[in-house]
Amino acid sequence: GDVYKRQVYWSQSGNTQAMAEAVGAGITAAGKEAAVVDVSSVSTAELKNAKAFALGCPAMGAEVLEEGEMEPFVTEVEGFAAGKTIGLFGSYGWGDGQWMRDWVDRMSSAGANVLNGEGVICKEAPDDEAVAACTDLGRQLAAV
């Protein structure tokens, strides 16, 4: 099986990175090894053989994924997402989470099993509730 459960994220202000670290903490707490990596330092090839992984990205612009690095990465993942269990998470500063609903729809349409059928989102920096939700997401990933 997988040695590492990977969380790949893009973060501008550090909020989504904090969420990624909480997901990683949940994986570690469940007795598995976590790899929390910035999207700029990972290739989609590293996820192809994984049964489960998490992706994190904040809402950008008009409720879209970050277009320079994360969007192309997610587009590649769509090509092999069928049958994978994927956790999604990210922070937002405005709006109501439409970017995440769109992202969940994309991954589901590609055949992925999105954990809990929705992403973990929080406004601005993750509060205790958001950290707990991310940690729980990590525990779920570790069990796959």
Model-derived features with residue positions:
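FMN-binding flavodoxin-like domain, especially the glycine-rich phosphate-binding loop
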Residues: N15-A18, A22-V39, A45, N49-V144
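Short, small-residue-biased leader/transition segments that mark boundaries at the very start
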Residues: G1-Y4
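Short hydrophobic segments within beta-strands
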Residues: V8-W10, F89
